[in-house]
Amino acid sequence: MSADSQSIAATENEEKSHEVPGNVQHCGDMLSGQEETVPLGTSQESTHIKAEPEEPHSEGASREDRTPGTQRWMSPCPGPKDKGPFLPGGVVPSPWTPVLSRGGRTRERKMAAALLTAWSQMPVTFEDVALYLSQEEWGRLDHTQQNFYRDVLQGKNGLALGAVEMGKVVPALAVATLEDTKSIRTRARWAPGEDPKCGQHVASGPGTKLTRDTGKAGQLKPAPSESRPLKTPEDSGPEKPSEGEEALKSGEEGLVPDGDTGKKTYKCEQCGKGFSWHSHLVTHRRTHTGEKPYTCTDCGKRFGRSSHLIQHQIIHTGEKPYTCPSCWKSFSHHSTLIQHQRIHTGEKPYVCDRCAKRFTRRSDLVTHQGTHTGAKPHKCPICSKCFTQSSALVTHQRTHTGVKPYPCPECGKCFSQRSNLIAHNRTHTGEKPYHCLDCGKSFSHSSHLTAHQRTHRGVRPYSCPLCGKSFSRRSNLHRHEKIHTTGPKALAMLMLGAAAAGALTAPPPAST
């Protein structure tokens, strides 16, 4: 066997031994050299191979090292005077990258190219396709160029990962996958100009990652191999969609929200109402259970929905961001503004299905429908009085407790209902928003306008039960009733009534 054949065989055996994961080398020897090296990104012999200065070899060097005109091209570690490769971002490169010199023999250069061709068909990790720069080259780059190479390294801007030489991006041997790109940050990293201390050991080899050992400071440990087959830009076809993408396309249950498909798969067990979202069902169930988990920190009032609590808290802040463009009146809620604007437009969108009466508010329609059904489900526990709405019951209960939570900011007078406070404020401002269409007279209260309009129509709905006299206002009836109960006139009428009753019931006089 010739000397060249023996050299090739020895080199192949050495390469196989280097492929075994877990080969431990001193990191100080790996990164402290002075020789500038760049890995070959392709299997071809190209102009990207850098020349290396020749050094005298020691007598104990291997046969490959003693070969004239060559340098170590499958060396596991650079020599102590070599300058190791530097990877932007501080990632430690793989030490098994072939390095050639221009002075090598043609036969050995061809053999290296053949080995690279075989090596390109093996599963590799991210280190095999990473960007390699020497520390000196990295230091010559300005801040913009360094950021650009970092972007290329992380797969940004659609660029494939490749080898970098003297500021030029070389097409990569393989395109790193997303998992490989993300795993960069899990490897051991050193900042530019920072070298690991001597005595630290690095597990190297194909399929090996480097991670910091949190158990011992300054130590590194190998991570599980996550090598993947190579993908070249020419051979790579359309990628197979992931399981999540296939599930989204097929509409697999649990990955596609029912709200997107229009289905109402969540049913209420009590009333059978359907919902597209489970959260909506949970909120709806509180209407049956009466649960109110959201509490106002200012007044202690509780709500079943967080949105209702947020709307309520505006009352305490006094904020009124919604203004009517017609009368410039401000409101704390947008829905209240919409209801107010119907006063100007005359719109009454809510119609009773029994009598066709129209209303501007839904709550007014619900209250009106109680007159047809006679249902009053809300009962006062103190006086047993019933009401059609829960809000009416709450207002009524203040007559028992004496609570008046609405004070006037001008005079300090308190009221049990907000509507009474609003009407009272008009006595300070002099506002009279209610106008009679017949005579143009204005009023501060809507009830005053309603009573006034009866004078034009001649309607007198309030009648005295004792004498039958009718009145257009309830207050006039109450004033009239006092005539029957108090005063000299009432006493005379009682005497006349008693006399008349006695005359009718007195027995006939006895005959003589």
From Swiss-Prot:
SMART domains per the UniProt record, alphabetical: KRAB, ZnF_C2H2
Keyword Metal-binding: yes
Function as written in the Swiss-Prot or TrEMBL entry: Transcriptional repressor that binds to the promoter region of Mpv17l isoform M-LP short and regulates its age-dependent and heat-induced expression. By regulating Mpv17l expression, contributes to the regulation of genes involved in H(2)O(2) metabolism and the mitochondrial apoptotic cascade.
Recorded GO MF terms: DNA-binding transcription repressor activity, RNA polymerase II-specific; RNA polymerase II transcription regulatory region sequence-specific DNA binding; zinc ion binding
Gene: Zfp13
Superkingdom, taxonomy of origin: Eukaryota
Record's protein name: Transcriptional repressor Rhit
Entry keyword annotation includes Acyltransferase: no
Chief location: nucleus
Residue ranges with Basic and acidic residues bias: 47-67, 228-252
Organism expressing this protein natively: Mus musculus
SUPFAM superfamilies reported in the protein's UniProt record: beta-beta-alpha zinc fingers, KRAB domain (Kruppel-associated box)
Similarity comment: family membership: Belongs to the krueppel C2H2-type zinc-finger protein family.
